[in-house]
Amino acid sequence: MNIYAIGDLHLSGNPPTKPMNIFGPHWDNHWQRIKEHWLSTVTDEDIIFLVGDMSWALRLDEALYDLKEIASLPGQKFMIRGNHDYWWSSANKMKNAMGDAITFLQGHGTARIINLTTQVNALTGESQSTEHQCILAFGGTRGYICPDDASFEPDTDQSIYDREILRTEAALQEMEHAIQALQKGHGETENTEETLPVTRILLLHYPPFNENNAPSGFTDLMERYHVDICIFGHLHDQISFKRIPSTFGTTKLELVSADYAEFKIQKIL
C-alpha cells in the first residue's frame, strides 16, 4: 500500500462549465492529465487524500458528475472541504449520494493498521519493495487564513479561524482515540506489549500558517499532537510555491495543489 494526495482539482462537469485554462495554458486538459497519471500510478489498495476544491458546483446534485468521476478512479479516497466546495452538504446527504466510494472528513479523524510499502536498495543495487505494518492516523478540516495574513480581517475572519482551530483539534483528538484503540487491540490479538509505529497525517485545505509562515493555532496543534505530515493545497502562485518550507518544527509539509504538482498525484508515503 502507498499513500498519495492531491488538491484543487477544480472540476466543473463535462464539457467543463468553468474551464481552468482561463487561469493560464498550463491548465489545458488538466483533468485528463491528472487521470492519466492517477491510472498509471495508483492501485485500488492505495489511499488517496483529496484536500479540497474538488468541484465548482454550487449544490451536491450538481457536483455528482465530478464526484463520480473521482470515485471511478483507483484508490481509497478521503476528502476534506475546500473554500470553493460550495456543494458540500451534510455528512448524511453526502454518504447517501456516494456510499463508500468517497469518505468525507470534516473535523473528524480516524486510524487504521496498514501494510505500508517502502522501497529499499538491495546489496545488488536494485530497488526492492518491502512492507511493514504500522498505524496510519489521519483527519482534518478546511482550515482558514491565519491572523496577520494580508487578507485577514479580524472582524469577520477571527471567528471562522477560531472555529477551524476547534475542528482541527477535534479531528486530532479522534485520531488519538483511534490510535489507542488499535494499539490495545493489537496488543491483545498478538499477545504482546510492543506497540506499532504510528504516522499522523493532518489534512487541511489552507496552509497551516499565514503568508509569512508564522506560527499559528494550526502549527501549535501540529506540535502538541505530534503530527508527522501536514498535507494542504489552496495555493496557486509561484511566490507561494517558493515560500513554503519543507518542514515546520518536526512536521513535514506537503503542498499538493494540482498545478503545483504539475497535475500529478503526489506520493506521500
Sequence positions of predicted segments:
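Conserved beta-sheet core of the metallophosphoesterase superfamily
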Residues: 78, 100, 132-133, 208-269
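Core catalytic region of metal-dependent phosphoesterases/phosphodiesterases
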Residues: 2, 16-119, 214-226, 251, ...
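Active-site glycine-centered loops adjacent to acidic/histidine catalytic or metal-binding residues
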Residues: 8, 52-53, 82-83, 205, ...
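Residues at the C-termini of beta-strands that transition into short coil/loop
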Residues: 7, 81, 108, 142, ...
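Short N-terminal binding/cap micro-motifs at the start of the first secondary-structure element
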Residues: 12-17, 262-263
